[in-house]
Amino acid sequence: MFSKLNLLCFFILILLFSCSKKNNDLSVLKKDNLENQMIEVYKQGIEEFEKGDVIYAGKKFSEAELLFPQSVWAPRAVLMSAYGYFTQGYYGYAINDLERFLVKYKYHPQIDYAYYL
């Protein structure tokens, strides 16, 4: 009985020590890095939009919004995506983006433009 109790305590100690170690392998994205990534993706979306590849640009704008939705660039990305889809005749995609903009950014200064589109 005594040896079983010692064995049980030993395994509990091993379990506790294995759980208490810091995991240094985790990669943590800082706010600055995430915002820089978001701006870079937004710029890629602008470049693709200027080249005429509206579908890929729309995907890049959506990716930019998902990366950092609190940024001032996020609502702009949604509007650019909707505008690109609208100009190329992809009205369903444009309406989806505009509805998402109207729900997420109710008090944005460019809300009138979203209603106009």
Language-model segments: residues:
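Bacterial Sec signal peptide processing site at the extreme N-terminus
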Residues: F17-Q37
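Short solvent-exposed coil/turn linkers within tandem alpha-helical repeat scaffolds
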Residues: L67-A74, L102-D112
